[in-house]
Regions:
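Iron-sulfur-cluster electron-transfer modules
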Residues: 1-185
């Protein structure tokens, strides 16, 4: 995650006496590697969170996928084919997707705050939607408790972070464009 290190501690970012920008240099290197076709299929598969997450919420399929992912044989296969270490923690697919099961917001008057517009657009993310919908439900409870109106963004794409880590900047751009359209109609 060299592209994120500049946010906390990387000393090799502008302004720098030698005009270094290490995080962006690393990002350019991964983009070049991706364009050359040197990224393995397993990494591409793992970065396709919207495709992989489609299994979440499908009765029986979720239980089968989660059970198989816990077997030693499957974990060894994932190691050899996808590069996922057999002992690495894997999030389970949720039995219900956040987007499918989240209640609509109660009708509330939007009251602008001192520093905020008084309403929230919820971009649920792949992880909340497919793996941990409880996080999203907790957020909705918090918003309801504080009488803050919300809307769950429809038709958003993955934020693109897994694709960014691969160097797949073209797909990141497509996701960004789709998400801007969904967030700012």
């Amino acid at each position: 995650l060299c592209d994120l290190c500049s946010m906390i501690k990387c000393p090799f970012v502008p302004p720098h006496p030698w005009n270094l920008d290490f995080p962006h240099t690393m990002m350019r290197a991964t983009a070049i590697t991706f364009r050359k076709g040197e990224v393995k299929g397993g990494a591409k598969f793992l970065a396709s969170t919207d495709v992989n997450g489609q299994f979440a919420g499908i009765p029986i399929v979720v239980q089968v996928v989660n059970a198989v992912n816990r077997t030693r044989t499957a974990r060894k296969l994932m190691d050899s084919q996808l590069g996922v270490h057999p002992d690495a923690w894997l999030p389970e697919l949720a039995s219900q997707r956040f987007r499918w099961s989240a209640p609509r917001a109660a009708s509330r008057v939007v009251t602008n705050g001192e520093r905020t517009p008084g309403k929230v657009a919820i971009f649920s993310t792949c992880y909340v939607n497919y793996n941990e919908p409880g996080i999203g439900f907790d957020l909705l409870k918090l918003l309801d408790h504080n009488a803050i109106p919300y809307v769950i963004v429809e038709k958003e794409k993955c934020c693109g972070m897994p694709k960014l880590e691969l160097g797949d900047l073209e797909t990141v751009e497509k996701h960004k464009t789709a998400n801007i359209a969904a967030l700012a109609p």
